[in-house]
Amino acid sequence: MESIGVLMMCPMSSYLENELEKRFNLLRFWTSPEKSVLLETHRNSIRAVVGNASAGADAQLISDLPNLEIVSSFSVGLDKIDLGKCKEKGIRVTNTPDVLTEDVADLAIGLILALLRRLCECDRYVRSGKWKQGEFQLTTKFSGKSVGIIGLGRIGTAIAKRAEAFSCPINYYSRTIKPDVAYKYYPTVVDLAQNSDILVVACPLTEQTRHIVDRQVMDALGAKGVLINIGRGPHVDEQELIKALTEGRLGGAALDVFEQEPHVPEELFGLENVVLLPHVGSGTVETRNAMADLVVGNLEAHFSGKSLLTPVV
């Protein structure tokens, strides 16, 4: 397989790079100063693309690579891959489901606690020496708060199970009712927000879910409600979020993802009722290595004529 060209779109994992380089002719797209020259030079040898939540395979890239056979995503999300174009050209697509579910769900609960109990502020309070001047202000309890989840898939379900351990009633919105769960279903996101103290975004990003959390949803969540986003940045209308937070119409927000990563609206930096993370939902050594193994395993299976491990297309 050493002659098979694999185009890696951006830095993802040194472990993944090493494993790919052992097996294939690895081409690093981000290191090339002349990307068009790289594609023209290797267009016939590139048979696989490895992308992630930041960079995948759009229609133009797919058209530029006539011998492309498979796109393997180092992510569970597929919003950076033109799935329609892949289906049209018979290109296989894989992702990394399941292995990152637990980490992302853990982080969602961590964000809830960090926001409600103001853990980041508490840390700064101690470091700055302010504790000597007086006690920190009282915060908000998590246990018993109603948690609304947008998207009750693998990750959403894992978040729900964790929140249940905090005696939280669980509500959800999904494309369809889940008959095998006891959680309360709401037919619209606005209805869900109106009946939840904490709203968690955990659905895939599609054209239908882009800005699924808009001004109407934020107003329904209200001045005591908080928003947690561990999905994708474009799920939330960031400009409306900034307005809702600064105007006091929304109680707080904890965000692991943003609309234009790695660029974060500076208006959020000065707000005390927000927690901001650099898209680290699956960012543990164990999970990233497991994701890398899935990417490599899918490529090896494809080029060996075997069944894909996690096929999407």
Curated annotation (Swiss-Prot):
Effects seen without this gene: Elevated levels of hydroxypyruvate and other metabolites in leaves. Under long-day conditions, slightly altered photosynthetic gas exchange. When associated with HPR1 disruption, strong air-sensitivity and dramatic reduction in photosynthetic performance.
Entry GO MF terms: glyoxylate reductase (NADPH) activity; hydroxyphenylpyruvate reductase activity; hydroxypyruvate reductase (NADH) activity; hydroxypyruvate reductase (NADPH) activity; hydroxypyruvate reductase [NAD(P)H] activity; NAD binding; salicylic acid binding
Catalytic activity reported: glycolate + NADP(+) = glyoxylate + NADPH + H(+); (R)-glycerate + NAD(+) = 3-hydroxypyruvate + NADH + H(+); (R)-glycerate + NADP(+) = 3-hydroxypyruvate + NADPH + H(+)
GO biological process: oxidative photosynthetic carbon pathway
Binding site residues for NADP(+): 152-155, 174-176, 230-232, 256, 279-281
Highest taxon in the source lineage: Eukaryota
Keyword DNA damage: no
Entry EC no(s): 1.1.1.79, 1.1.1.81
Any GO CC annotation of this UniProt entry: mitochondrion
Subunit structure, as described in the record: Homodimer.
Described purpose of this protein according to its UniProt entry: Catalyzes the NADPH-dependent reduction of glyoxylate and hydroxypyruvate (HP) into glycolate and glycerate in the cytoplasm, thus providing a cytosolic bypass to the photorespiratory core cycle. Mostly active in the presence of NADPH and hydroxypyruvate.
Similarity remark: Belongs to the D-isomer specific 2-hydroxyacid dehydrogenase family. GyaR subfamily.
Name the UniProt record assigns to this protein: Glyoxylate/hydroxypyruvate reductase A HPR2
Species annotation: Arabidopsis thaliana
